[in-house]
């Protein structure tokens, strides 16, 4: 997406992605992501590309920040004819905010804004916690879930 379409510094971007100030359920100031019509089109196109690739027998890992049950539902509908393992990636809010600050290239307040929306009413096949477990432990959990799914198909 051309950079001029987006504004990640807090200004307006009516066509693309941008941050908008808001307040979270606990009263803290946050930034919510806003998607304009071009950003929405890109998001829909990502699903179309995923369908094309899986229909051609490609295995995919799709890393998408889907905002709650509606957006996850769009993915589930798009990929309903294919085997999918939906993994929710979580971490405590204080750790998420610390990571946001340490990265240095994030709009502070965006992580808190996403925290309260991303997993809202979403049921995953597997959840992993990137703070409570190591990368290696989470990889093993995902591999185990895939293995169990494959074994259940053979029964």
Which sequence ranges carry the predicted segments?
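Short hydrophobic/aromatic-rich motifs at helix boundaries and adjacent loops
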Residues: 19-23, 43-48, 66, 86-87, ...
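Amphipathic alpha-helical transducer elements in NTP-driven molecular machines
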Residues: 36-47, 90-93, 136-139
């Amino acid at each position: 997406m051309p950079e001029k379409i987006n504004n990640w510094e807090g200004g307006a971007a009516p066509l693309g992605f941008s941050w908008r100030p808001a307040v979270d359920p606990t009263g803290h100031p946050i930034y919510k992501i806003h998607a304009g019509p071009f950003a929405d089109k890109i998001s829909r196109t990502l699903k179309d590309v995923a369908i094309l690739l899986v229909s051609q027998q490609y295995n995919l890992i799709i890393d998408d920040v889907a905002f709650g049950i509606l957006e996850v539902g769009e993915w589930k509908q798009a990929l309903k004819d294919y085997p999918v393992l939906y993994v929710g990636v979580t971490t405590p809010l204080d750790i998420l905010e610390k990571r946001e600050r340490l990265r240095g290239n994030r709009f502070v307040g965006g992580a808190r804004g996403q925290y309260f929306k991303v997993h809202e009413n979403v049921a995953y096949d597997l959840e992993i916690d990137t703070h409570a477990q190591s990368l290696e432990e989470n990889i093993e959990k995902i591999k185990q879930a895939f293995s169990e799914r494959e074994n259940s198909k053979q029964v």
